[in-house]
Amino acid sequence: MPSLAELTKSLSIAFENGDYAACEKLLPPIKIELIKNNLLIPDLSIQNDIYLNDLMITKRILEVGALASIQTFNFDSFENYFNQLKPYYFSNNHKLSESDKKSKLISLYLLNLLSQNNTTKFHSELQYLDKHIKNLEDDSLLSYPIKLDRWLMEGSYQKAWDLLQSGSQNISEFDSFTDILKSAIRDEIAKNTELSYDFLPLSNIKALLFFNNEKETEKFALERNWPIVNSKVYFNNQSKEKADYEDEMMHEEDQKTNIIEKAMDYAISIENIV
């Protein structure tokens, strides 16, 4: 069995190389060793420089675990790692509480809650953070999920969409939640549209739901069982049946007109013969 130091070194190399699957394999035996050495859960009553230094290393291990979990879309694992980091990040020990990854991981945790539509816990956590971190929104990373939540609550979907489209401030881990949150925005707009309209032109739906083309819009409409008739999207069967009936009536009128025209042509031809 490799030592804790050897396992930690292998973890660091795997993470730097972007081998997140290897990170996930290394982390369980590392956590076992941390538990054996009373390091996984910090005992802040121990005021020993060596122990505190070991806790700093443990914090970095947990941060790697959290970030690797995001990269592999293992959000349950990410949440577990973040909860294990909380005693460090919100410790009274300044050295333990500081980290260059702290703002990023807190933001990812808040985005994870938003992606689950867990707004109650999101706002509860926000209140907790507000007590422990001054001027939350002055931090460019922390302000990202806060703005997103505010605009979603206000129904300012264009602003929320633009923020998601902005490339998540070049934080690649944020992109793990982008598609989920975009889908949530589309679903919310779709629900409101269904309640407000009987039908809308396909081109309007494309613009409303931020689609790039009508083919994507048609696919979305069919997934929601929205009938499409003559480039119009219908949101209830009654409206669709009415559209079908009107379409059928127009077709019958065209047929009648065609028959009458043929009859008139025939009558004129007979008259000319006589």
Curated annotation (Swiss-Prot):
Keywords: Proteasome. GO terms for cellular component: nucleus; proteasome complex; proteasome regulatory particle, lid subcomplex; proteasome storage granule. Pfam families: CSN8_PSD8_EIF3K. Residues 76-251 form the PCI domain. Gene3D superfamilies: 1.25.40.990. The keyword Magnesium does not apply. The keyword Acyltransferase does not apply. InterPro entries: 26S_Psome_Rpn12, CSN8_PSD8_EIF3K, PCI_dom. GO terms for biological process: proteasome-mediated ubiquitin-dependent protein catabolic process; ubiquitin-dependent protein catabolic process. Belongs to the proteasome subunit S14 family. Acts as a regulatory subunit of the 26S proteasome which is involved in the ATP-dependent degradation of ubiquitinated proteins. Necessary for activation of the CDC28 kinase. Present with 9890 molecules/cell in log phase SD medium. This is 26S proteasome regulatory subunit RPN12. It comes from Saccharomyces cerevisiae (strain ATCC 204508 / S288c).
